């Protein structure tokens, strides 16, 4: 015995291993080994944690003969339609965690998008909510969709993001909202990182935050698209446990999941398995293996049932899908479930046929007014811009550095009659720089081009956080202060360094025209970004649209020398009105003669300069008026394009 102990010690084993070796040598029972590891009870799955949420009526969803088709190819080529979903029927009840499974391309996400109301055109069949035909607007107010990619605004903290959600979704007092947010964060294990920016969260924390944002108003129906995608096993278990607790709290929770582990698979209450757009199984999880066995498909021992059904659907055991389709259509799934659970032949108590009355919140479009939504979104967007230090600092420093460079290049030429054309070149370049400085950043950071921001907007808007007009106004107006400050900084540098007239009125007009031109360019950037389908398209279209705008600005070619059939193009150039206004500001308004340091100065009289540049009949107020019209028209057009894009997503 001593030799065995010494041998165990010699092998580097610890005291516990030595004791076990000795006990085994004596033929005794091995001692129970205790370690420092202890399994901690996961309280995040307790439904009681969510009892504080606002009370909402439970919802059951039923779908009958549901089909979905899309047009193949472009609309101008009539190639027919492709059917993605075929004759799907079933019922998803409250207090159940339903998993939609299937191989890649089976139609899982399409199916859930239709159930959530994100897809309408091309759908056939009927969807019932609590036994009544679904009213899409009402249904979207009582449901939420948590997408696969947890796109969050990176510059907000967890607490700030939650308060934005609470302020938009609830009409209670601020103290009640704060208490509710604190309780949700505590229940989901996010309180410790409440002051951490969302960009620094882990994958599991981001997923839980995405759920927390939608839990604020306690939606009775929750859709999850691949909630475990990209997470480790521990985070996957936490997320699925959380979904199960939400379901057992009275909600209808539906999620797509690709290939869960056996541990996660057993946590689902019911399954709806798709293959090639058709259902191959629907029912409780425990019925899957007996059901397949009855069809002659035996799952190997110790094999994950989720893996087995995916292998069957993928054709690894032959083309068995037609047989599975017929079995479901003939009602074998329903009969198998009744056979295994005779007590379930009657309708469960938690899946009533009489629809309950909807909550008062469902009778309103949004929980808050458009003005309140605008104020909340404006503050959030403005805060995000301020915290985006890279972009904000680059914008500010570029105006300062370019301003100093231009000031040094055109130093003290503003009152020199022999350098009039150099001065007009300075005025035109100022318009050129301010145009591109406002146009391109807007194009490249537009919501519909930046996928992250687009996903955030689509999730929040389609989950009925706010209206499209409130979001658009807040988004566009939040950037206006920066489009005012940057041109003013640039003008304050170049105006005095280049020696322009030392009059306050002229400087203010110079700055106002610069700001107006920058705002119009920003509006054009919004339109280009909203209309472009990709970043590459927007990057190409932005500079291309600037070419005719600059060409017909009046600097390269005067209006009189433009061919008659092209003169109309000059009226569409907003740079023309900005440049024309600057010429009138610097050389108009009854300015006195310029300083002449040479023997002959043909442009000493400012009126001659105005005549030469073909602006002597122009009116300064008209330039401001036309720039204002451009600003409003482009903003309105960008809004209409955004609205069209949002509708086309459905």
From Swiss-Prot:
It comes from the Eukaryota. Expressed specifically in the brain and the eye. Expressed in both neonatal and adult oligodendrocytes. Residues 415-423, 498-507, 558-621 are extracellular. Gene3D superfamilies: P-loop containing nucleotide triphosphate hydrolases. It is a multi-pass membrane protein. GO terms for biological process: cellular response to high density lipoprotein particle stimulus; cellular response to leukemia inhibitory factor; cholesterol efflux; cholesterol homeostasis; positive regulation of cholesterol biosynthetic process; positive regulation of cholesterol efflux; regulation of DNA-templated transcription; sterol transport. ATP binds at residues 102-109. Residues 1-393, 445-476, 529-536, 643-650 are cytoplasmic. Keywords: ATP-binding, Cell membrane, Cytoplasmic vesicle, Endosome, Membrane, Nucleotide-binding, Translocase, Transmembrane, Transmembrane helix, Transport. Its main location: membrane. The chain crosses the membrane at residues 394-414, 424-444, 477-497, 508-528, 537-557, 622-642. Its EC number is 7.6.2.-. It catalyses: cholesterol(in) + ATP + H2O = cholesterol(out) + ADP + phosphate + H(+); desmosterol(in) + ATP + H2O = desmosterol(out) + ADP + phosphate + H(+). Half-transporter that form a functional transporter via homo- or heterodimerization. Homodimer. Heterodimers with ABCG1. Whether ABCG4 is an LXR target gene, is still under debate. Studies performed in monocytes, and in one astrocyte cell line indicated that ABCG4 expression could be up-regulated by oxysterols and other LXR ligands. However, subsequent observations in a number of different cell types (primary mouse cells, oligodendrocytes and neuron-like cell lines) have not confirmed this observation. Belongs to the ABC transporter superfamily. ABCG family. Eye pigment precursor importer (TC 3.A.1.204) subfamily. ATP-dependent transporter of the ATP-binding cassette (ABC) family that may be involved in the cellular efflux of sterols, in particular cholesterol and desmosterol (a cholesterol precursor), to high-density lipoprotein (HDL). May play an important role in the removal of amyloid-beta peptides from brain,in a process that can be antagonized by desmosterol. However it is unclear whether ABCG4 can directly transport amyloid-beta peptides or whether peptide export may be facilitated due to changes in the membrane lipid environment. Induces apoptosis in various cells. This is ATP-binding cassette subfamily G member 4. It comes from Rattus norvegicus (Rat). The lineage of its organism: Eukaryota, Metazoa, Chordata, Craniata, Vertebrata. The gene is Abcg4.
